[in-house]
A protein has these predicted regions:
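C-terminal motif of bacterial Sec signal peptides marking the signal peptidase cleavage site
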Residues: 14-15
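Bacterial lipoprotein signal-peptidase II cleavage site
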Residues: 18-22
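Terminal, low-structured helical/coil segments at or just beyond the last alpha-helical repeat
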Residues: 219-249
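Sec-dependent signal peptide recognition
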Residues: 1-7
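Ankyrin-repeat boundary/"N-cap" motif
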Residues: 23-32, 55-68, 93-106, 139-145, ...
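Ankyrin repeat A-helix N-terminal signature
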Residues: 32-37, 70-76, 103-122, 149-155, ...
């Protein structure tokens, strides 16, 4: 997973207008339109057959990525609704193998000057994509998924909705072995106690170990998140048929 760095809005917005010029598409203008959620620009360019809904656009951290992933990364809800309605590929991937729902589950709005963080737009993006049928599990081998990203970022609303929609609490783990960090491990390494609790209540197995690596508890202790130790140790102690709620709460 790569946490992507922002580039200036001015670079994105340059040359962007709701009434697009005719002729070949300007990639920077397209990226700028998505960044400011200008659905009119995007729709007009699609209807003019200058682009398709599955074309790429420049976005935060990429020279080019599928439009739906750029849209999800920006939390551009109007453009996202349009792309979904226009049958864009919901499971298209960035060069880092991230899908739109994964990016929507990871990021948030941050206003550092006001010390304000909001997940509202991104929570809605997760809902839109999940309700439209986006694949919640990563079909590529040894790759992260949306639930893991939500756990890593402490995105509780997104995490709970993904679980409600059927996301697997243990990811792709089998026989208590995983070849990529499980959602519980992702929460543990970041010290996200509430996310860890939600996952344990949903049946996440605290005894899963990364192949030749660590368990969720070991990740937590390695990163000095001792406030997770009690719940993860209790999770490890569950006997067959026991639930986290019945034994640990």
């Amino acid at each position: 997973m790569r946490l992507l760095t922002a580039f200036t809005a001015a670079a994105l917005v340059a040359g962007c207008a709701t009434n697009p010029p005719s002729g070949p598409i300007d990639p920077q203008a397209l990226g700028g339109a998505i960044a400011i959620d200008d659905v009119g620009y995007v729709r007009a360019r699609v209807e003019a057959k200058a682009i398709t809904v599955n074309d790429s656009a420049p976005g935060i951290g990429y020279d080019a990525a599928p439009m739906i992933t750029v849209t999800a990364r920006n939390g551009a809800l109007n453009v996202l609704r349009y792309l979904i309605a226009a049958k864009a590929d919901l499971n298209a991937r960035t060069p880092d193998r991230d899908t739109a729902v994964m990016l929507a589950a990871l990021f948030r709005d941050e206003d550092r000057e006001r010390n304000n963080v909001s997940t509202l737009r991104y929570d809605q993006a997760v809902r839109l994509l999940a309700d439209a049928g986006a694949n919640l599990e990563n079909t590529e081998i040894n790759a992260y998924n949306a639930l893991g990203y939500a756990a890593y970022a402490g995105r509780e609303n997104a995490l709970l909705y993904l679980l409600q929609k059927g996301a697997r609490a243990n990811g792709a783990a089998q026989a208590r072995v995983s070849y990529v960090n499980t959602p519980l491990m992702m929460a543990a390494m970041q010290g996200q106690r509430n996310a860890a609790l939600h996952l344990l209540r949903a049946g996440a197995d605290a005894n899963v170990r990364v192949h030749n690596g660590l368990t969720a508890l070991e990740f937590a202790l390695k990163n000095k998140h001792t406030h997770l130790e009690k719940i993860l140790r209790c999770g490890e102690s569950l006997k067959p048929g026991e639930t986290f709620r019945s034994r640990c709460e």
